[in-house]
């Protein structure tokens, strides 16, 4: 008799995706991040749902409703900090997942890679709108500054900003619609994840060697489910340590002050996971140029499949490309640091140099290094 997981029309889909899925036998811990991101997304949706039960999307009561959640709701403080720090954990895993994709040449799966970029934009939009909801000083002013960037769009910019605000400034209408979008987007993200999955399972997973692994596959369960559980335990240990010992470590103290449109914070900045893009935005003196650079800093990922000139897919046996990737990583850390600093000398200059280096490394140097490695292979 056929096993139910192989015959039942619904369970059969799950079986082919998570149990009997043929997986390369040599994939490392770097392939854990997909499952960890899925768990993180589930955690964010559940905690967010419980927070939404107590939160009020009104400029007068939003700040006090968050205080009420932390003080009066059973384990409200835990739910709130799990949600806030869960977002940070989500982005850490997301950046590692993208980094692994670049290192091992997973971007050659074009459909999977492009859906991944779309997912990144959706997650960034969700996180930005979530940051506005507590209605602290940084929430309100962050929303004002970032939405105001759209006014740089020729002809329709100002109208578009006022349309998003629902008035002539960030106010109750803005907060209400941001809450509506922040609530609905996390239910659209799993749909995009399913498409991401679908395209990945069309081609099969990549592996550290970058070679075709059709001749050497093993079932996903139990080998990689055990490995994923190990990754989950490490992730939960890190997240719970952050939540229970230093819940405000990654937050901004200004957000514990209720929003006041008459008092500007000394330094407006987004959450830490957007600082690299914010630094690129600030490094260009022109408003429209800054907005374009901000969008391109993420959209440049879509060019990776076209920029790949190497005869090898993975960077495992390409030491020069490895050095270049680690230089790019260091550059991103510098941009993140600069994004959190005030707009003054020498931070402006460092930010501009790091921004130029970011695009120059990806668009030009990586191609030259790949061609050089191809030459070396012929010797």
Swiss-Prot record:
Gene Ontology CC terms, in alphabetical order: mitochondrial inner membrane; respiratory chain complex III
UniProt: heme b b562 binding residues: 83, 182
Classification via SUPFAM superfamilies: a domain/subunit of cytochrome bc1 complex (Ubiquinol-cytochrome c reductase), Transmembrane di-heme cytochromes
Signal peptide: none
One Pfam family hit: Cytochrom_B_C
UniProt cross-references to CDD domains, sorted A to Z: cytochrome_b_C (cd00290), Cytochrome_b_N (cd00284)
Membrane topology, from the record: Multi-pass membrane protein
UniProt GO MF annotations: metal ion binding; ubiquinol-cytochrome-c reductase activity
Sequence positions that bind a ubiquinone: 201
Cofactor note: Binds 2 heme b groups non-covalently.
Compartmental location: Mitochondrion inner membrane
Record field: transmembrane: 33-53, 77-98, 113-133, 178-198, 226-246, 288-308, 320-340, 347-367
Assembly mode: The cytochrome bc1 complex contains 11 subunits: 3 respiratory subunits (MT-CYB, CYC1 and UQCRFS1), 2 core proteins (UQCRC1 and UQCRC2) and 6 low-molecular weight proteins (UQCRH/QCR6, UQCRB/QCR7, UQCRQ/QCR8, UQCR10/QCR9, UQCR11/QCR10 and a cleavage product of UQCRFS1). This cytochrome bc1 complex then forms a dimer.
Function per UniProt: Component of the ubiquinol-cytochrome c reductase complex (complex III or cytochrome b-c1 complex) that is part of the mitochondrial respiratory chain. The b-c1 complex mediates electron transfer from ubiquinol to cytochrome c. Contributes to the generation of a proton gradient across the mitochondrial membrane that is then used for ATP synthesis.
PANTHER family, per the entry: CYTOCHROME B
Family named by the database record: Belongs to the cytochrome b family.
Note: Heme 1 (or BL or b562) is low-potential and absorbs at about 562 nm, and heme 2 (or BH or b566) is high-potential and absorbs at about 566 nm.
Protein name: Cytochrome b
Native species: Dolichotis patagonum (Patagonian mara)
Upper classification of the organism: Eukaryota, Metazoa, Chordata, Craniata, Vertebrata
